[in-house]
Curated annotation (Swiss-Prot):
Originating organism: Dictyoglomus thermophilum (strain ATCC 35947 / DSM 3960 / H-6-12)
Family under the similarity heading: Belongs to the CinA family.
Protein name from the UniProt record: CinA-like protein
Record-linked CDD domains: cinA (cd00885)
Domain of life (superkingdom): Bacteria
Pfam (any one): CinA_KH
HAMAP family membership: CinA_B
Length: 411
């Protein structure tokens, strides 16, 4: 099978951004035994994009195109692809639902451009985008295959690894099996550095790292004659990865961080209450996602105002006056106060500056403190986060749950 990589985007032609997608795809396709014969880059121009598709399919069996799936008027890869194959664009309801949920979760307004992203080429199969808004597609037409993926690497790479790789491997003989390790508490780059040599030397199984909203993921994939053989191959690699990453790995597969936390609370027969300031109830909402959590989670209090922290959580006024509401001292007192108020074994708290206003040189936007009280023992974690208000609140929530998880593991 001859493959061509088609990169779409005027910014690539102008040199405004580096085309890392082509490099990544070429390397991974080579590892999968699929030769890449051509690389083409074309701007956001419908006539030139259509011509690029004509040339590509005149010499290749499969074209993987990245970019041009965004919400703006010059994102036309799907439209041109539909025209090239003489097909219509049709609304994919499940993709529209995912996009709406993506925006609602972040408190953002949905635009017509975003709705446009839910349209797919008639007769194609959808590549779900769990990392952004634009779904990809796989279109088989005769003996030709077109695969469309978003341009942002943080979306393209995990979509390729999660959905496209199994599709491509289906053309080869044998069994394909994967395991996903979920990592929290370290960034994607730090995690990758820890296992860099394994990634470079492994061809079967392969190891693919990528990020997903405050956590990192490692997908280990093996090809073998039987599922049992593939599992054995994967287990050897997973065992080595676990030695290097330790309890940064919180789970496997589709296990969520909150599910792991609730499972630990259950095993240790502990109850918890939560005091939130900058997160405004997000931590509690994550825990409540887990069925059966009511046995362990007794309640929460959103103490946004300093007077509420003092009156309801018994945070000493002198602590706020001396150290401020955004401080380790305040966070720990909030955690202790909510545990005592609700009579729980554990108290968890979060206080910080989510922005966009409120920051100072000493305490910038993104400074967050997480407090933890476990049966009389107090601890805290300081975070220095970046991004907009919603991102800071989301990452605080994830870090708070992970800090709690680690506290429970140490009991």
């Amino acid at each position: 099978m001859r493959c061509e990589i088609l990169s779409v985007g005027t910014e690539l032609l102008l040199g405004d951004i580096l085309n890392t997608n082509s490099q990544y795809l070429s390397r991974r396709l080579a590892e999968l035994g699929i030769p890449v014969y051509f690389h083409t880059t074309v701007g956001d121009n419908p006539e030139r994009l259509k011509k690029a598709l004509e040339i590509a399919f005149s010499r290749s069996d499969m074209v993987i195109a990245t970019g041009g799936l965004g919400p703006t008027q010059d994102d036309l890869t799907k439209e041109v692809s539909a025209e090239f194959f003489n097909k219509k664009l049709v609304l994919h309801e499940e993709s529209l639902k995912r996009i709406k949920e993506f925006f609602e979760k972040r408190g953002l307004a949905l635009t017509e451009g975003n709705i446009k992203q839910a349209y797919i080429v008639e007769g194609s199969r959808v590549i779900p985008n769990d990392w952004g808004t634009a779904p990809g597609i796989i279109l088989e037409e005769g003996n030709k295959i077109l695969i469309l993926l978003p341009g942002p690497p943080k979306e393209m790479i995990p979509m390729f690894e999660t959905y496209v790789v199994p599709y491509l491997l289906s053309f080869s003989s044998g069994i394909i099996h994967s395991r996903v390790l979920r990592v929290c508490g370290i960034g994607e780059s730090f995690m990758e550095e820890k296992v860099k040599d394994l990634i470079k030397t492994q061809t079967n199984p392969t190891i693919a790292p990528y990020a997903k909203e405050g956590e990192a993921i490692l997908r280990v994939t093996a090809r073998a004659d039987t599922k049992e053989e593939a599992e054995k191959m994967i287990e050897r690699v997973v065992e080595e990865i676990r030695k290097r990453l330790g309890d940064y790995i919180y789970g496997e597969g589709e296990t969520s961080l909150e599910e792991v936390v609730v499972d630990l609370l259950s095993k240790k027969s502990l109850t918890i209450s939560i005091a939130e300031s900058c997160t405004g109830g997000l931590i509690s909402a994550r825990l409540v996602n887990v069925p059966g959590v009511s046995k362990f989670f007794k309640g929460s209090l959103v103490a946004y105002d300093n007077e509420i922290k003092i009156r309801e959580l018994n945070v000493p006024r002198e602590i706020i006056e001396k150290y401020g509401a955004v401080s380790s001292q305040c966070a720990m007192k909030m955690a202790e106060g909510v545990a005592q108020k609700m009579g729980t074994d554990i108290g968890l708290s979060a206080t910080g500056i989510a922005g966009p206003e409120g920051g100072t040189p000493e305490k910038p936007v993104g400074l967050v403190y997480i407090g933890l009280y476990i049966r009389g023992e107090l601890s805290y974690k300081e975070l220095r986060l970046s991004g907009d208000r919603n991102r800071i609140r989301l990452y605080t929530t994830i870090n708070a749950l992970d800090f709690l998880r680690r506290g429970l593991l140490n009991l």
